[in-house]
Amino acid sequence: MKKRLIIAPHIDDELLGCFSSIDENCFILYVGCDESKINFKWVKQRPDLQQRLDELNLVQSKLHFSYEILNNQVNSYVIQDLIPEFERIINKIQPDELYIPVPSYNQDHRVVYEAALTAMRPHDINFFVKKVLVYEQIQDLWNHNYHEFKPTFFRLVDIEQKIESYHLMKSQVRSFRNGNMLKNLAAIRGIQSNLEYAEGFEVLRWVE
């Protein structure tokens, strides 16, 4: 079975951008989950954070992926801190496919993208990932001035399961990325790929 590694800047980015790639052979690395450094031993003192983690575990129980959360401050990611962490997880998982977020107006997404580019470079001591894909975020559609997403790879998605899983993350649901919008985007990607509903990706590297 193919091993997939998804690097998600925040909890829920993976559901929005590459739900079709998530299964029991998938490992998700969450770069951060809060705007402050977290002592996970004392998480119960933060009801909002506890809710977020409980929601994540509900989704994990449904989709059966493995995950790790890095203790970085959301909105304050530092590329020099992320590169060694990404190299570590790539070497640990040795994935067949790596998924990274599209760079966008969101500063965290840009930093994660740039750090991932460095971490996946050909290197004597690091594992070389042969297939690297960039996934999109529906909230980026309003403005393409930074990076115009042009999908060149498509995968069939069970859109009802995607929406159902996303709604388990109640604290993260927003009006500008609601179920109808997710379905509409999946329909557009489906039209582009002759599928009913699909997710689109940019191929950054594909080595056979």
Model-identified regions with their sequence ranges:
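Active-site rim/loop-helix segments in enzyme catalytic domains that contact anionic ligands
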Residues: 1-93, 122-125
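Metal-dependent de-N-acetylase/amidase catalytic core
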Residues: 1-5, 24-27, 65, 76-208
